Amino acid sequence: MNKLLTTLIALCSLYCGAAAATAANYDNPDTLVVARDGTGQFRTVTEAVEVCRAFMDYHKVIFIKKGTYKEKLIIPQWLQNIELCGEDRDLTVITYDDHANITMDGSFWPKELKDQLLAMGDRPKLGTFRSFTVRIDANNITLKNLTIENNAARLGQAVAIHTQGDRLTFVNCRFLGHQDTVYTGMPGTRLYFSSCYIEGTTDFIFGPSTAWFEQCVIHCKANSYITAASTPKEIMYGYIFNNCTVTAAADVEKVYLGRPWRDYGYTLFMNCELPAQIRPEGWHHWQKEREQTARYMEYNNRGPGAATGQRVGWSRLLSKKEAQQITLENVFSLKSEWTPVAP
């Protein structure tokens, strides 16, 4: 095996764990290499995803070399057990620039989206839920050491990552955008974000999924709302931020922790660092009647924005006993056993 491939295997071992650790693993081939400069097997991430077998019962790594990949990527629902691993978090970037108010023409889109467009006939606006850069419909998918970006101008909602699958893990990733950066789109699905950076303006983490954010940096780029949970009534947990750090741009003055997109939205910040830009009331109701149903909580936060004396009366402070029940095992095992492990 030539020196280049040997080097790539070493990099995968360092950044992605065991799947790409040896030449034998590369040759079988359970590791695919993507490189814009042609030194891998594929030049785009989409090409690598398309060669993966449906419903694989083994682990496959797609190793993505440093570079900027402008593509609208869909990981379809018939795939599973795939890990997308970047060579460098900040220098391995998947980016696109769609936003909700673009008139659709389907250029450079995956065939699935082009077919939807043709069926509509009258070239409507793109809308929030087609504006994604990456959409994950599959289960058991991991992303590591990657930047997912929607770099559209601030002309409407612009999703960077749109999730539909269950048991999705994101480790040391950046999610960059403005409004609606991270859309967790399917009720009952479970997502785990570890050591990630997420930025945005309005409602930039939103949707109905159950998602745990561990040691993440949440950066507010404008006066607005961090979360817009739409957790269904029958689902016990929505968004949980644990040991996270919330930051804000220098010109930002007021930020709400969240507002309920639907009646029973669930959001909990615990053991987090909150900046002075967090509004004293903490939360917004979106619609007055949601004060009766929204599930908004805090526990053991710190920093200038963590004072709870002026919080809205319909939010709650958890007791120590209640907080002890909020564990990964408890939150993610309600549907089936799953405890994600972030190496």
Question: Locations of the language-model features?
Answer:
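Bacterial Sec-dependent N-terminal signal peptides
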Residues: M1-A24, S107-Q116
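Sequence-level preference for short, compositionally simple segments enriched
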Residues: A24-P343
